[in-house]
Amino acid sequence: PAGPDSEMRGLMFAESIRAMEASHWKRLSISHWARATRERNFYNYFAKGRTDCLAFGPGAGGTVSGYGYMVNRNVDEWKASVAAGEKPVAMITAPGRFWNEARALNEQTELNYLDPAALERLYPIAFSELWRPAIENWLEAGLIEPDGSRYQLTVSGQFWQGRLTQALMDLLASASK
């Protein structure tokens, strides 16, 4: 049978958040929760952010100075490469023009918020003006809500977080051409 459509997945996502909160789990990031104070998850935040992240093991991904890389996913091929003294790297991608800005934006949306003014303090780009039409649309659609000088992603916005982030980066890329 076919999987659930986007609307049903959104409803399931919202229900999962309610269930986790009702069970007193603490939200660590867009996709990670903790039950006790000893539980941590820094990987996704740092791997998607501006920090270099060294990846080890089959299927792991990392970044160094903006260059992304993926370790071979096939365990047998990975073992053979390591045994032969070779790096088991499956692919490497060069950083795009706005990789730093993209990573800074990812750091925000990974933690369920958007703060164009904070990005403007880091980079000489008028993010607030550039993204104004999208932000106004998302406010009207209920995907984000004002939170002081920044915007908080609503549950619906959290569901669409990856696409919202990509849309903002697409606007940045198209405006710089």
Language model features with spans:
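A short, conserved structural fragment
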Residues: L139-S149
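Short, amphipathic alpha-helical interaction segments positioned at domain boundaries
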Residues: S156-K177
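Short secondary-structure transition/capping segments
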Residues: E39-Y43, A141, F159
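Minor-groove-contacting beta-hairpin "wing" of winged helix-turn-helix DNA-binding domains
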Residues: R150-T154
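C-terminal scaffold of the Radical SAM
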Residues: P1-I125
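Short amphipathic alpha-helical interaction segments
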Residues: P124-E140
